[in-house]
Amino acid sequence: MKNEMLALILAGGQGTRLGKLTQSIAKPAVQFGGRYRIIDFALSNCANSGINNVGIITQYQPLALNSHIGNGSSWGLDGINSGATILQPYSATEGNRWFQGTSHAIYQNIDYIDSINPEYVLILSGDHIYKMDYDDMLQTHKDNMASLTVAVIDVPLKEASRFGIMNTDSNDRIVEFEEKPEQPKSTKASMGIYIFNWDRLRTMLVDAEKNNIDMSDFGKNVIPAYLESGERVYTYNFNGYWKDVGTIESLWEANMEYIGEDNDLHSRDRSWKIYSKNLIAPPNFITEEAHVKDSLVVDGCFVSGKVEHSILSTNVQVKEGAQIKDSFIMSGAVIGEGAKITRAIVGEGAKIGEDVEIDGTEEVQVIGYNEVVGVPNED
């Protein structure tokens, strides 16, 4: 039986620009917002859009990501007719190898895709923060009788040269694609979200492999090839909040934007929840000496210091006299007595010693996973 649409999440990115935060885990597994990991947003969008089968394509440091996703039950993807499948590079008789690009990762998993037998494939990135109804995008794809639909978002003209830009006619049909143009003709930036008719994409990828044609990347190869061959390629115009958190600055900004009673992501909208793996932790304890203002404090935290406009993830400890401002503290971190942290990201399990000062006023500071700063050796 043919399934309508299969989602494939590209989650193998190393995320080198995130430095210490991705030395031991893939970028989509990085924590966000106190109780989530970045990939939770793509997975939750799939669940909320009614997509039953999701393939997660991993490569770099997949252990934390695999453990987090498990069997997909946190997103309702563990039913009889649904599933979350981790797809990793493997060796085969015809020379499967490490993924050479985004579309090459799809080609290497043709057998899995064929086993689902979808009419459409939805290609997603696992490292963006946003909420989107993929079913609405699919309807646009059908209405346009498209072979490929690319989700786009309007960006300021001065930033357009950082993106792949789609130039369209009055009906949103793409007539030209420019990869990071110096002088952009439009502000419609690709979000790295695509819907393809699977039969057509499959044929193109297989033929390219047989004929030794480079078709390894959607932006560099596949989209230009579709346009050159006259395929019906359209945009889906997205107007909501979307953030590429591929740099330290953008990850910090997205977390700071997430704080607040009514943020642009509408995080408290119960009609479109963001799901994640449930971690059991005791209730928070806020001491008499503590002062917490305009902050998100997740389960299991012990706070005896001052916290302002910050996020404390699960099981964070803030000792007496410590001061945290405009910072994102990941789970299990310990902030020592009298420490002062400003505009920083503190990694999971990090320990900050007494009276240590971390000042990110000029540039956001990062403390890595399990990193110890200013704590004497116990030996």
Swiss-Prot record:
Question: Which Pfam families has this protein been placed in?
Answer: Hexapep_GlmU (PF24894), NTP_transferase (PF00483)
Question: Which SUPFAM superfamilies does the record match to this protein?
Answer: Nucleotide-diphospho-sugar transferases, Trimeric LpxA-like enzymes
**Which residues hold alpha-D-glucose 1-phosphate?**
G164, E179, K180, S190
According to its UniProt record, the EC number is 2.7.7.27
The signal peptide stretch is none
Its UniProt entry gives the catalysed reaction(s) as: alpha-D-glucose 1-phosphate + ATP + H(+) = ADP-alpha-D-glucose + diphosphate
HAMAP family according to UniProt: GlgC
Q: Which family does it belong to?
A: Belongs to the bacterial/plant glucose-1-phosphate adenylyltransferase family.
Q: Which GO terms describe its biological process?
A: glycogen biosynthetic process
Q: What is this protein called?
A: Glucose-1-phosphate adenylyltransferase
Q: In which pathway does it act?
A: Glycan biosynthesis; glycogen biosynthesis
Q: Which UniProt keywords apply?
A: ATP-binding, Carbohydrate metabolism, Glycogen biosynthesis, Glycogen metabolism, Nucleotide-binding, Nucleotidyltransferase, Transferase
Recorded source organism is Streptococcus mutans serotype c (strain ATCC 700610 / UA159)
Gene3D superfamilies noted in UniProt: Hexapeptide repeat proteins, Spore Coat Polysaccharide Biosynthesis Protein SpsA, Chain A
**Biological role stated in the UniProt entry:** Involved in the biosynthesis of ADP-glucose, a building block required for the elongation reactions to produce glycogen. Catalyzes the reaction between ATP and alpha-D-glucose 1-phosphate (G1P) to produce pyrophosphate and ADP-Glc.
